[in-house]
């Protein structure tokens, strides 16, 4: 398994729009590109950390061309909500002891 850690700095008063666009884009990537999903965490009022899981680095690197046309609009909205988007880490999983019993929301 492979994981990518992202950091998003969101513009004032754009948090709800950002979260909605992030959810929509993440769902599309999961459905069409073979990701294993992602989690979004709030760091500060306008800063978020997400990690996305993939079967392997190659699947992640080759993703992007299978998305439906509406993904471009969702991506544009998400980017417009942010002052900065960066990849903090690209990580190969050594051990996985994470279990999810409940979902947030």
Predicted segment positions?
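Glycine-rich beta-strand-turn "strand-cap" elements at beta-sheet edges
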Residues: 2, 37-49, 72-105
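Active-site-flanking beta-strand signature of metal-NTP-handling nucleotidyl enzymes
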Residues: 2-8
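Hydrophobic pocket/interface hotspot
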Residues: 6, 18, 22, 38, ...
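Short coil/turn motifs at secondary-structure junctions
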Residues: 11-13, 43, 55-59
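Short amphipathic alpha-helical segments
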Residues: 12-37
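Intrinsically disordered, low-complexity regions enriched in Ser/Pro/Gly/Gln/His and often acidic
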Residues: 15, 47-53
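An amphipathic, aromatic/His-enriched active-site/gating alpha helix that lines ligand/cofactor pockets
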Residues: 27-36, 53-89
